Curated annotation (Swiss-Prot):
Coiled coil: none annotated. Pathway: Protein modification; protein ubiquitination. Residues 154-166, 174-194 have a biased composition (Low complexity). This is Anaphase-promoting complex subunit CDC26. Residues 79-94, 102-112 have a biased composition (Polar residues). Probable component of the anaphase promoting complex/cyclosome (APC/C), a cell cycle-regulated E3 ubiquitin ligase that controls progression through mitosis and the G1 phase of the cell cycle. The APC/C complex acts by mediating ubiquitination and subsequent degradation of target proteins. Developmental role in early embryogenesis and the metaphase to anaphase transition in meiosis and mitosis. Required for embryonic anterior-posterior axis formation. It comes from Caenorhabditis elegans.
Length: 194
């Protein structure tokens, strides 16, 4: 029984401590929260501050601002209220956040276009290279495997000896042997596949 009483007393003490801490926190936080709420309810210029602080109370403050907007809608000075509410946003603490975004957004667009213009000339420079290689690659499009060997064939007189398989001379095949003519293309493809 004594073993059961000790944890119970400890739990009770913990609960008492938790309740005491929560009471103190409520006593300290509530007046601090109530004061700005009263100020915000009384002063219309604090509405943008409500919107600029979403993590503390999103739903309540947004509802309050929406209610105020709805109350201002039937009035003839709706535009004036919105303008006055926008003016404090620029003069409030949100200005350092909004000002750099506005100042950065305007020059970033021309800079990005200039960067795009700067990037394009290298691409245009690469295109002539591709066109040059394309001019040189025109035989490669027809004979992808034979192009390096065609250069060798042009220098050597052997291609006249083997008209059926232009690369047969590289593999030691002669046109007189029927096995060489039949095995020539297969040997070419096998050797080039590796």
């Amino acid at each position: 029984m004594s073993m059961l009483r000790r944890p119970l007393t400890q739990l009770e003490l913990c609960e008492d401590d938790i309740q005491w801490l929560t009471d103190q926190l409520n006593k300290r936080v509530l007046p601090a929260v109530i004061v700005p709420k009263c100020e915000m309810m009384d002063i219309d210029e604090m509405e943008p501050m409500d919107q600029s602080e979403p993590p503390r109370g999103i739903t309540r403050r947004n509802l309050r601002s929406a209610d105020r907007k709805n109350r201002d809608v039937p009035g003839p000075s709706t535009g004036e209220c919105t303008r006055t509410s926008i003016a404090p946003t620029l003069t409030s603490a949100r200005t350092p956040v909004a000002a750099p975004t506005l100042t950065l957004s305007t020059p970033v667009n021309p800079v990005s276009s200039a960067e795009m213009l700067r990037v394009m000339p290298p691409r245009v420079g690469r295109r002539p290279r591709a066109s040059r290689s394309g001019d040189n690659d025109s035989p490669l499009l027809f004979n992808a495997y034979d192009t390096p060997q065609q250069g060798i064939n042009d220098e050597s007189p052997t291609p006249s000896d083997s008209p059926e398989s232009p690369n047969a001379h590289l593999y030691g095949a002669t046109p007189g042997n029927p096995t060489s003519t039949s095995g020539g293309p297969s040997s070419n493809t096998r050797s080039h596949r590796h």
